[in-house]
Design a protein with these regions (language model features):
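Non-heme di-metal
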Residues: 1-198
């Protein structure tokens, strides 16, 4: 997958936190979600390209996920452009892609730690983000809430795809899924999931 020159990629602690109650802060928030969706497109396509020998349904599932992630990116980027900004105008971090690199040689780890951990965290983070945007209350913020509704609905399906293929892979290898997940999370330094949980 291609990587554009922008946005500038910085450590997560160096991504500035801005209030969504300002125009620039709202744009920065939209940009952050746009960056997640951009990476999600590449992650889904990498899952198709990198791992040979899976059932045909696996490839169909991840191509559908990639198409939905591209739709999300398009919705967010169009909204960002309506504010006078473009993808790449704010710095971003590369946590999602770093996990892709860490799991590039192990499809079971990929299914465990990208859709079932990082994408699942998005399910937890979206409702509080929407609540903040509702407090902003501007038409721009409320449109962002609507876009996040679409994303949240689709991401539930993406996590389910990851669960399906993680379970299938564990069954093929006679691995107990829960204990193996904990081992993979430790081995790959996956982020610990924090409440609130959705």
């Amino acid at each position: 997958p291609g990587r554009p020159d922008r946005p500038a990629l910085v450590p997560p602690v160096d991504v500035p936190h801005r209030s969504p109650f300002t125009a620039e802060g709202l744009a920065a928030l939209l940009h952050a979600v746009c960056h997640i969706e951009f990476n999600a497109i590449n992650l889904a396509l990498d899952a198709v390209w990198r791992f040979a020998g899976m059932p045909a349904d696996y490839y169909r599932d991840w191509l559908r996920v990639a198409a939905e992630e591209a739709t999300h990116f398009g919705l967010l980027h169009t909204h960002l452009q309506s504010l006078g900004y473009h993808y790449g105008d704010f710095p971003a971090h590369d946590g999602l892609w770093e996990m892709c690199v860490k799991t590039q040689h192990d499809i079971t780890a990929r299914m465990a730690l990208v859709p079932r951990t990082l994408e699942a965290r998005g399910l937890d983070a979206t409702p509080p983000m929407q609540a903040r945007l509702r407090k902003v209350g501007t038409p721009v913020a409320l449109r962002a809430v609507e876009i996040l509704d679409v994303i949240l609905r689709d991401e539930i399906g993406h996590v389910a795809v990851g669960n399906r293929w993680y379970g299938w892979l564990c069954a093929q290898q006679s691995i107990e899924p829960l204990s193996h997940y904990r081992r993979l999370a430790r081995e790959h330094s996956a982020p610990r999931l924090k409440p609130p949980f959705n």
